[in-house]
From Swiss-Prot:
Function noted in UniProt: Effector that promotes P.infestans virulence and suppresses pattern-triggered immunity (PTI). Interacts with the host ubiquitin E3 ligase NRL1 and enhances the association between NRL1 and SWAP70 to promote proteasome-mediated degradation of SWAP70, which results in the suppression of immunity.
Signal peptide: 1-18
Region (NRL1-binding domain): 126-135
Protein name listed in UniProt: RxLR effector protein PITG_02860
Record's subcellular location: Secreted; Host cytoplasm; Host nucleus, Host nucleoplasm
Species per Swiss-Prot/TrEMBL record: Phytophthora infestans (strain T30-4) (Potato late blight agent)
Lineage: Eukaryota, Sar, Stramenopiles, Oomycota, Peronosporales
GO CC list: extracellular region; host cell cytoplasm; host cell nucleoplasm
Motif mapping: RxLR-dEER: 48-64
Similarity comment: family membership: Belongs to the RxLR effector family.
Keywords, comma-separated and alphabetical: Host cytoplasm, Host nucleus, Secreted, Signal, Virulence
Record note on domains: The RxLR-dEER motif acts to carry the protein into the host cell cytoplasm through binding to cell surface phosphatidylinositol-3-phosphate. The C-terminus (residues 126 to 135) is required for the interaction with host NRL1 and the ability to enhance the association of NRL1 with SWAP70.
Length: 135
């Protein structure tokens, strides 16, 4: 059976042609395919616009803040980390990573989303453990 497929493949490579015979290709680009920029922007020419034509919107009404304030933790997160700081310090003494905390919390019977939230809080705790001393 393998010999039959092998002979069929060899005969196809010898006799067959991979190029289509009904397509004529020309190295010269047709002048009808070249369009000006203005014509290309018309919706009739292109069903989808690829270039942005909108004017730049005014950015005066954007809400701006300092970059340092963007990275500050939410007060709720800080309170939650301080509440869990004794547990987090025990994990830190065992040199546990966030996935270890997630695994241990999940195995102790908490739901997945609670374990994920606690492991995310532990990740933030690891950045500066001294800042989150307990109450």
């Amino acid at each position: 059976m393998r010999l039959a497929f092998l002979l069929l493949a060899v005969s196809h490579f010898i006799c067959g042609n991979a190029l289509p015979t009904n397509v004529k290709s020309s190295p010269v680009v047709s002048p009808g395919l070249i369009q000006s920029f203005d014509n290309a922007q018309k919706p009739v020419v292109m069903s989808r616009k690829l270039l942005r034509t909108d004017e730049r919107l005014s950015e005066a009404n954007e809400e701006r803040t300092k970059l340092s304030e963007l990275f500050r933790l939410d007060d709720d997160e800080v309170a939650a980390i301080k509440e869990l700081s004794s547990m987090f310090s025990a994990f830190l003494q065992k040199k546990s990573q966030a996935f270890d905390v997630y695994d241990e919390i999940f195995r102790s019977g908490y739901p997945i989303d609670t374990a994920a939230r606690i492991s995310n809080l532990y990740t933030k705790y690891l950045k500066d453990p001294q800042a989150f001393r307990g109450p």
